């Protein structure tokens, strides 16, 4: 439907030998539509994730705006994240962008927090919370945010 808008959010935290495959599709088949996708994950131990995202703009989907991003925080050297964003654009008047990032905890940031009397464990917890914060802000329900936060703390432990 012309003028439709969608926001997709995903949060994941893998550990052990978990393997998670995520496939997302933002299909623009009408004019003046907007899609906004943000998936964030943290990985521990020997876990692995694969995210494949696709924004499709059909020929009649003019003046659309599509965005997708996948960001991964590696908490162990043995964890692995593959991130494969994609665009299939058949229209000629669109704004479509994608982003992907895979990074590790910043040891200087952890050192700074520890120099202020914060234990390494709490410093890691704070850094992971900060990583997920932009996504958590997208969740309108306090109870859901609280439950997700509790699970994140459990997984970090």
Predicted segment positions?
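Conserved beta-strand/loop scaffold segments within soluble protein domains that form the structured core
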Residues: 1-111, 115-118, 132, 139-157
């Amino acid at each position: 439907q012309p003028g439709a808008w969608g926001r997709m959010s995903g949060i994941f935290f893998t550990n052990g030998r978990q393997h998670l495959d995520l496939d997302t599709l933002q299909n623009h088949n009408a004019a003046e539509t907007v899609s906004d996708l943000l998936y964030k994950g943290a990985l521990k131990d020997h876990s692995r994730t694969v995210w494949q995202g696709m924004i499709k703009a059909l020929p009649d989907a003019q003046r659309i705006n599509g965005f997708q991003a996948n960001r991964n925080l590696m908490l162990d050297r043995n964890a692995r994240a593959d991130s494969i964003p994609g665009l299939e654009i058949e229209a000629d008047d669109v704004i479509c962008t994608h982003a992907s990032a895979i990074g590790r905890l910043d040891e200087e940031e952890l050192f700074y927090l520890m120099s202020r009397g914060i234990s390494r464990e709490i410093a890691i917890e704070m850094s992971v919370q900060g990583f997920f914060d932009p996504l958590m802000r997208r969740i309108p329900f306090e109870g859901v945010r609280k439950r997700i936060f509790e699970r994140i703390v459990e997984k970090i432990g």
